[in-house]
């Protein structure tokens, strides 16, 4: 006979990024857990990035969230691959999938807003608190950390030995508004580094370009603009939200500890 008075397991998710928000909603759906979401007590700037997910992850979104606007997810059935030669870029391979989509791309800030509203609707307890030490979480049966690698709490549970590598490269990201027709997801293997194009609406796409960090010494905005002009064969575009991040490898031996 089921004990209706059985105490629910208390679980906390630390971090309110996409992974933290989705984890909180997924665990709350089980019904047998007391789920708390803990996030830093400060205001975040908008996450002006895009994310590409597989078809199975797209289906998972619909299992976790009651109502989700399909227009927020831009589907892709085709991926074009290009190679830069001396005087042109050649389309050397295409991936096509007629029966299903290969991936979906969405804008992080729009989906994050929906997830936060869903958490409020489900009445998942949200705690605004800066977690500096693991002992701050002692009252929970399980702790799930959805934090960045630089988090002090995260660093305290992992093995000190790790594999680190500085690729001496940066990833340049941004949005492009255009009037081109039939813009597909694409990967360009350029001499300066690989450039990925991820459409997220009819006339917008995000890009990620991995290049040598020495290029930061140049006028990076002009450099990026001229290369995208060249790749798209048009100057009728608008580039916005351009940012850059260092590319580094950081592999740990362990990512868990007891109830964490």
Where are these regions (language model features)?
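Short, Lys/Arg-enriched N-terminal segments with co-localized hydrophobic residues
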Residues: 1-5
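Beta1/beta-strand and adjacent pyrophosphate-binding region of the FAD-binding site
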Residues: 6-19
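Glycine-rich FAD pyrophosphate-binding loop
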Residues: 12-14, 26-49
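Conserved Rossmann-like nucleotide-cofactor binding loop
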Residues: 19, 43, 150
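N-terminal glycine-rich dinucleotide-binding loop that anchors FAD/FMN and/or NAD(P) in oxidoreductases
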Residues: 49-71
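Conserved N-terminal helical subregion
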Residues: 59, 63, 74-172
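Conserved FAD-binding catalytic core of PHBH/FMO-like flavoproteins
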Residues: 149-244
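FAD-binding beta-loop-beta segment adjacent to the flavin cofactor pocket
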Residues: 245-260
């Amino acid at each position: 006979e089921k004990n209706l008075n059985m105490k629910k397991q208390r679980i906390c998710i630390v971090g309110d990024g996409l992974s933290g928000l989705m984890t909180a909603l997924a665990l709350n759906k089980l019904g047998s857990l007391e789920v708390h979401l803990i996030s830093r007590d400060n205001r975040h700037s908008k996450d002006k990035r895009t994310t590409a997910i597989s078809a199975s992850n797209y289906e998972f979104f619909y299992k976790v969230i009651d109502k989700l606007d399909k227009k927020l997810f831009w589907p892709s059935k085709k991926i074009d691959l290009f190679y830069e030669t001396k005087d042109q870029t050649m389309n050397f391979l295409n991936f096509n999938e007629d029966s299903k989509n290969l991936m979906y791309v969405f804008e992080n800030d729009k989906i994050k807003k929906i997830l936060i509203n869903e958490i409020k609707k489900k009445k998942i307890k949200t705690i605004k608190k800066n977690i500096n030490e693991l002992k701050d979480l002692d009252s929970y049966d399980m702790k799930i950390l959805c934090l960045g690698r630089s988090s002090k709490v995260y660093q305290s549970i992992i093995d000190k030995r790790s594999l680190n590598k500085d690729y001496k490269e940066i990833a340049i990201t941004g949005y492009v508004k255009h009037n081109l027709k039939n813009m597909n997801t694409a990967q360009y293997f350029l001499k300066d580094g690989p450039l990925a194009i991820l459409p997220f609406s009819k006339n917008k796409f995000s890009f990620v370009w991995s290049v040598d960090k020495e290029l930061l010494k140049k006028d990076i905005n002009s450099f990026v603009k001229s290369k995208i002009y060249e790749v798209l064969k048009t100057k009728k575009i608008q580039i916005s939200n351009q940012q850059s991040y260092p590319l580094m490898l950081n592999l740990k031996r362990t990512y868990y500890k007891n109830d964490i």
